[in-house]
Amino acid sequence: MFPAAPSPRTPGTGSRRGPLAGLGPGSTPRTASRKGLPLGSAVSSPVLFSPVGRRSSLSSRGTPTRMFPHHSITESVNYDVKTFGSSLPVKVMEALTLAEVDDQLTINIDEGGWACLVCKEKLIIWKIALSPITKLSVCKELQLPPSDFHWSADLVALSYSSPSGEAHSTQAVAVMVATREGSIRYWPSLAGEDTYTEAFVDSGGDKTYSFLTAVQGGSFILSSSGSQLIRLIPESSGKIHQHILPQGQGMLSGIGRKVSSLFGILSPSSDLTLSSVLWDRERSSFYSLTSSNISKWELDDSSEKHAYSWDINRALKENITDAIWGSESNYEAIKEGVNIRYLDLKQNCDGLVILAAAWHSADNPCLIYYSLITIEDNGCQMSDAVTVEVTQYNPPFQSEDLILCQLTVPNFSNQTAYLYNESAVYVCSTGTGKFSLPQEKIVFNAQGDSVLGAGACGGVPIIFSRNSGLVSITSRENVSILAEDLEGSLASSVAGPNSESMIFETTTKNETIAQEDKIKLLKAAFLQYCRKDLGHAQMVVDELFSSHSDLDSDSELDRAVTQISVDLMDDYPASDPRWAESVPEEAPGFSNTSLIILHQLEDKMKAHSFLMDFIHQVGLFGRLGSFPVRGTPMATRLLLCEHAEKLSAAIVLKNHHSRLSDLVNTAILIALNKREYEIPSNLTPADVFFREVSQVDTICECLLEHEEQVLRDAPMDSIEWAEVVINVNNILKDMLQAASHYRQNRNSLYRREESLEKEPEYVPWTATSGPGGIRTVIIRQHEIVLKVAYPQADSNLRNIVTEQLVALIDCFLDGYVSQLKSVDKSSNRERYDNLEMEYLQKRSDLLSPLLSLGQYLWAASLAEKYCDFDILVQMCEQTDNQSRLQRYMTQFADQNFSDFLFRWYLEKGKRGKLLSQPISQHGQLANFLQAHEHLSWLHEINSQELEKAHATLLGLANMETRYFAKKKTLLGLSKLAALASDFSEDMLQEKIEEMAEQERFLLHQETLPEQLLAEKQLNLSAMPVLTAPQLIGLYICEENRRANEYDFKKALDLLEYIDEEEDININDLKLEILCKALQRDNWSSSDGKDDPIEVSKDSIFVKILQKLLKDGIQLSEYLPEVKDLLQADQLGSLKSNPYFEFVLKANYEYYVQGQI
């Protein structure tokens, strides 16, 4: 498969161009690092462990935990090809022995540590592991369903019920198999071979199936060769629910194939040929690779959402063609005839990795160029950045049917890739890493041998050979992943008297080790890891930081890891001769020989990446806690990320230094002077500043100080005046964006799935406050740009500085968001609320000026991203853009934008706009107005919901007590709404009578005498609603001097409106009313008349009796007893008037008894 045919192509200048010419098997390839440092060369620096020491150390440990002796299978220059794990189970050996030469055997190596061999109608599943001495007796043989086609391991899938990372027992492993026709057989537990469920997938037509994949929630996806995907969900009842995954539901579906192709996104096509599928467990995403596109689905336990379909032909063909044939003079003619097939899809830390084969039929000789394309999935779409690595594997083209190469990427955290077919394996790199492994072909061409499949176990690449069984391919230990000079320096830093024996002799005695020694020993373990000696590295780590250690040990771990990371970041370039006299005698010991500062920074970034890989591999990452920084604790994992962010920022700053040396050098001198650094004569200020990367952020404040000085000194119309603002903005923006970009893109490297304890509040270095803090710097620059630069700038300069300022504000607000997310709302509510209030205020302070300056688009971009609804509403109001407001209501529906807008209208007194919302918003407006009934009736009338309006108005009238006039108006409006509604005749009559009763009561207040109101200084339009007792009191009070029988009769009528709940004795009040009426007349003499009835006929009391009689009231029941009336204290002096008593009794006899 991998002949040593020379490539006719000339390599390009970049590391991602075409293959090098004349490289055959075992050749040392180019490297992705600096020239002249082939990674395959021997390491000449001092080593920590000699081979003898390594063997003795292993034997003294008893049972080793990582690296083991294995039988070497084949010769290789750069790689160890050895048998993997324990010997194959007897059933597997028998199957291989009894199989005929032409029998199709396939293997599936599952990342959960199981291998599946398909041999004819049998499926053999067994447990695999790194250790050859572990007793692995688990081996099950299952019967496959009948099929007219060959059975394939691609149609076997295992699902695990135990959490990821745990050892899976047979009880926790479920197995599903499929045939190409669609027959399904499902074993809910591998422990029960005889217990299974069968089903058949019939999706119509003559489809055949190619892949079966275990996905979310114990379910599976069956993929047809035509790219139809079917979700299979086993149910507890024994049935297997099946449904087809949705197609073309992405954000651009429905806009047409021609239009969507402009975006690189296509609708599914019926003529697609499926090449590969991929399940991303971390993101719950499923990908399919076809002959023309990559499609993505987002899954939960029972449903799926189609995210997008990406046209790889349009997006990748030119990149691949250019990488291979780009240097040809007739390139434009060549690229029209290039053929490309997309063969396989895998994933690593850099993104999706596609294996593609390209050839041009007119080439002589015509070769197949295998390339690895890395693309990052940004969630809703693919990244624009594409990396094409053209491998050095380029066999002659024979037939398209013979292009059968496959890909495995065994370790997610690095860039090593393995291409394979039935006769050979080709080791290479994806080209996105900081170093390149030697590319080499490993042949399996012994008689009867072939490669049946490949996969990974614990990050180790595994090949299944027909003759040798499970085989691992690993880089030789003496090929360090560090650059040769850096690796040697690291070894020197931990080497000392008897350093080789010290590590194991000290740790095996289990004595207390000083913190400094722990750091040194951990460095030594890191060095061994870089030399691919994971076994020794793990042993050192296990001794230093036992998994059963106490809290003190874990805090020492945080200190040691942090110190090593800082040492890497602030390393002295000791082997640079200019630094020779300036390196402290006890420098940390990570020196490198790059004479160019930029390369020094890049090497430090590589070393940091290796350190993170090491921390993960040896099991320390999950134990990291917190470490103090800037006076407060920070999660150590995030502190490590901060170190890499500062390296990213320093690299960006160095690039600016190359272009803007005067500006950056001035700021560097200010920073170094503040630290009171003396610069050696043989070094530049930049040498000194960029060496200490941990302090790179100090330059930000210094840039502003220089900028302010220039703005004060330079004329406003000078080029220097404008350039200094633009350049300082650019440097700050690019540094902060580089840090933020690293934090987001490499999040998986520093993310902890489940934290055992709550982590401290996270304040990124890009969000520090106080003097010199980045937040302080941004606020200060915000003021400089808007108050100094902007007013004096022309329109072009204004556009430039505004765009830069928006980027700085974005970084500022993003820091607050990260900080807020780290505060636990439930346990620290007060802190969260205070921080959120601070954030909201700062957000408003930074964005509001953009509105004032009319920079609406920039203000909108930030306000939309950070959900500043106040800014968005203000902007729409200022520009009278109602359609944009409606869009925001939809866009931010889940964040209650509509409620915010309605509340804003209320607060600003814009009730007309509130009530003039389009019909589409009526539902939300109605919900909002439920809490604002004083307005909701207007919306209900506007919406012709008159019954609701009547009820709302009546409710408001019933609750109104503050203003009599308002209550009367609301009651009147309620009656009008009822009359205009669709109430039935009976219902309407009932409601009208209810309201008329209230109006009768209100009439008593409305008809209070004007003289009385003036006397009491009352006004009907401003009066509160009075209760019945209050009205009675007014009608019978002495100030009502003109009170007559009508007033007292009203007072008596009001007794009917006193509720039983009120603590008032109605009979006593009635007695008081009658007594007050009696007192209004003169009862001193008869005026010469003998008839008491005639004498009193004009008295108010008698006129009241006459009105009561006229109303048909039974006086004997209504009036109090005459004796009770005569004894009432309210009569005052009348109580002792004999004449009054005579006349009263006479009237009682005349009117009361006469009625009887």
Curated annotation (Swiss-Prot):
N-acetylmethionine found at: 1
Omega-N-methylarginine: modified positions: 17, 30
Main subcellular localisation: nucleus
Tissue/organ expression: Widely expressed in fetal and adult tissues. Expressed in the brain and kidney.
Residues found modified as N6-acetyllysine: 787
Positions of modified residues (Phosphoserine): 7, 15, 27, 41, 45, 50, 72, 131, 480, 489, 493, 501, 755, 1133
Function: Involved in poly(A)+ RNA transport. Involved in nephrogenesis.
Protein name, UniProt field: Nuclear pore complex protein Nup133
Organism: Homo sapiens (Human)
